[in-house]
Amino acid sequence: MAEKQKHDGRVKIGHYVLGDTLGVGTFGKVKIGEHQLTGHKVAVKILNRQKIRSLDVVGKIKREIQNLKLFRHPHIIKLYQVISTPTDFFMVMEYVSGGELFDYICKHGRVEEMEARRLFQQILSAVDYCHRHMVVHRDLKPENVLLDAHMNAKIADFGLSNMMSDGEFLRTSCGSPNYAAPEVISGRLYAGPEVDIWSCGVILYALLCGTLPFDDEHVPTLFKKIRGGVFYIPEYLNRSVATLLMHMLQVDPLKRATIKDIREHEWFKQDLPSYLFPEDPSYDANVIDDEAVKEVCEKFECTESEVMNSLYSGDPQDQLAVAYHLIIDNRRIMNQASEFYLASSPPSGSFMDDSAMHIPPGLKPHPERMPPLIADSPKARCPLDALNTTKPKSLAVKKAKWHLGIRSQSKPYDIMAEVYRAMKQLDFEWKVVNAYHLRVRRKNPVTGNYVKMSLQLYLVDNRSYLLDFKSIDDEVVEQRSGSSTPQRSCSAAGLHRPRSSFDSTTAESHSLSGSLTGSLTGSTLSSVSPRLGSHTMDFFEMCASLITTLAR
């Protein structure tokens, strides 16, 4: 059990020094934290033991947190660690700098349809991931959807949701009334997933319209509107998305759209990245994955026989079984995402003979994809010779490193044209060193600091090119050969912030607050220049946004 300590007048929990308050929730505050050694920023949710003890949910929260630490989805805020003190639980979570979707809509108004669809696809993918692992959110709203620096959605606050099982009904009313389903505000029994679908429908409406489908400052009138299920559909919404909204906002939960229905809807399927809903036909649920079993044993400090007994018990809520399936699912998601983020290393049997290849000016073979030349031979050796321990060490090939980048078989000029298009779309600035080498920077909207990286297109064999990403620290001096050509791509919303939670027995007497206006090649850490602060994480975010944009 960790103890709270003082660090230069600030509270320190474990290795994290707590800073400013990011928000206040039902059970306590959320503060920004900084790792004392690495400087990486995290969000720290503080759960007051006394408050959760009064609700008799201490044991349940502990069990949920144990499983949520294993959740790994690109659009769910990660829970890294839980630190306990005599008075509080400290949930150390992923920090994103873009703020709440709610604030974004309040500031910018309704979102363009294509962008709304992209965000909604990400949100639904995250909700589906949690539902498949028996977790319901029950309080989905734009305030719980966070945005990273590149406008990708990340759902937060799964930590206090109920684990669900077949036949179990959630009797508690929680959440914000504007986003709550009719069965929730009416105090009726509900199973769980369908209330998240309703809330997703409200979020989609807010994205497309900049307002809420059900809204009234008088709570009893608001409840009447929600129970009636009648809402205004603006003329500018196309018929396809309007039918989807009406299906998701069905008052009868039995008639309401399921995630399967939404995924099959024509509007939702447009430009849908496959990594959001991975399918692996080779996966057989009847085959036990030994590596996953070992990983569960390491994380839970248990024996393999205990894990096997949990898997054969058939209890979907057993914590070891849940952990095992999480690990399997995460692996499947990463494999599917490889179409967008993973560029595999070149075939190890390829020969790098410059005389056999035409290399455009400014483009060079990748230095770590070229075997060393033998002094008495004009030809290069096969990289597989490095595995032959019987050969002299002087002839051994140095093991190739992994690099952050994208591999492609397109023409080099076409690759660079796509890079320029993506950089302009992302509002990056760049300097041209030569036709295949750029120095790029992006300004962090929160800190105001610039994140810099080098993009270099390499030839890896006679058919493939590697666009290599390399972090540039502030101390790196720009090469004089580059020509400085910085490039940049070039209302009041009807949303208000409802109460963060409500009790179904007293909700009718509450009034709402006022309106507000308004193909990763892997990464060797040697190719990244880690330093104190969030530079490395900013660099990876920058890489991810560029890779994602190029993949579209």
Curated annotation (Swiss-Prot):
CC cofactor: Mg(2+)
Post-translational modification: Ubiquitinated. Phosphorylated at Thr-172 by STK11/LKB1 in complex with STE20-related adapter-alpha (STRADA) pseudo kinase and CAB39. Also phosphorylated at Thr-172 by CAMKK2; triggered by a rise in intracellular calcium ions, without detectable changes in the AMP/ATP ratio. CAMKK1 can also phosphorylate Thr-172, but at much lower level. Dephosphorylated by protein phosphatase 2A and 2C (PP2A and PP2C). Phosphorylated by ULK1; leading to negatively regulate AMPK activity and suggesting the existence of a regulatory feedback loop between ULK1 and AMPK.
Keywords assigned: ATP-binding, Autophagy, Biological rhythms, Cholesterol biosynthesis, Cholesterol metabolism, Chromatin regulator, Cytoplasm, Fatty acid biosynthesis, Fatty acid metabolism, Kinase, Lipid biosynthesis, Lipid metabolism, Magnesium, Metal-binding, Nucleotide-binding, Nucleus, Phosphoprotein, Serine/threonine-protein kinase, Steroid biosynthesis, Steroid metabolism, Sterol biosynthesis, Sterol metabolism, Transcription, Transcription regulation, Transferase, Ubl conjugation, Wnt signaling pathway
Effect caused by changing residue 45 to R: Complete loss of kinase activity
Outcome recorded upon mutating residue 523 to G: In a breast cancer sample; somatic mutation
Protein kinase domain mapped to chain residues: 16-268
Catalytic activity line of the entry: L-seryl-[protein] + ATP = O-phospho-L-seryl-[protein] + ADP + H(+); L-threonyl-[protein] + ATP = O-phospho-L-threonyl-[protein] + ADP + H(+); L-seryl-[acetyl-CoA carboxylase] + ATP = O-phospho-L-seryl-[acetyl-CoA carboxylase] + ADP + H(+); L-seryl-[3-hydroxy-3-methylglutaryl-coenzyme A reductase] + ATP = O-phospho-L-seryl-[3-hydroxy-3-methylglutaryl-coenzyme A reductase] + ADP + H(+)
Cited InterPro entries: AMPK_C (IPR032270), AMPKA2_C (IPR039148), KA1/Ssp2_C (IPR028375), Kinase-like_dom_sf (IPR011009), PRKAA1/2_AID (IPR049020), PRKAA2 (IPR028783), Prot_kinase_dom (IPR000719), Protein_kinase_ATP_BS (IPR017441)
Outcome of swapping residue 371 to T: In breast cancer samples; infiltrating ductal carcinoma; somatic mutation
Modified residues annotated as Phosphoserine in this record: 377, 491
GO biological process terms on file: autophagy; cellular response to calcium ion; cellular response to glucose starvation; cellular response to glucose stimulus; cellular response to nutrient levels; cellular response to oxidative stress; cellular response to prostaglandin E stimulus; cellular response to xenobiotic stimulus
Key word Lipid metabolism present: yes
Protein localization: Cytoplasm; Nucleus
Compositionally biased spans, kind Polar residues: 480-490, 501-510
SMART domains with a match to the protein in the record: S_TKc
PANTHER family in alphabetical order: 5'-AMP-ACTIVATED PROTEIN KINASE CATALYTIC SUBUNIT ALPHA-2 (PTHR24346:SF104), MAP/MICROTUBULE AFFINITY-REGULATING KINASE (PTHR24346)
Oligomer and partners: AMPK is a heterotrimer of an alpha catalytic subunit (PRKAA1 or PRKAA2), a beta (PRKAB1 or PRKAB2) and a gamma non-catalytic subunits (PRKAG1, PRKAG2 or PRKAG3). Interacts with FNIP1 and FNIP2. Associates with internalized insulin receptor/INSR complexes on Golgi/endosomal membranes; PRKAA2/AMPK2 together with ATIC and HACD3/PTPLAD1 is proposed to be part of a signaling network regulating INSR autophosphorylation and endocytosis. Interacts with ARF6. The phosphorylated form at Thr-172 mediated by CamKK2 interacts with ACSS2.
Role this protein plays: Catalytic subunit of AMP-activated protein kinase (AMPK), an energy sensor protein kinase that plays a key role in regulating cellular energy metabolism. In response to reduction of intracellular ATP levels, AMPK activates energy-producing pathways and inhibits energy-consuming processes: inhibits protein, carbohydrate and lipid biosynthesis, as well as cell growth and proliferation. AMPK acts via direct phosphorylation of metabolic enzymes, and by longer-term effects via phosphorylation of transcription regulators.
This protein's name: 5'-AMP-activated protein kinase catalytic subunit alpha-2
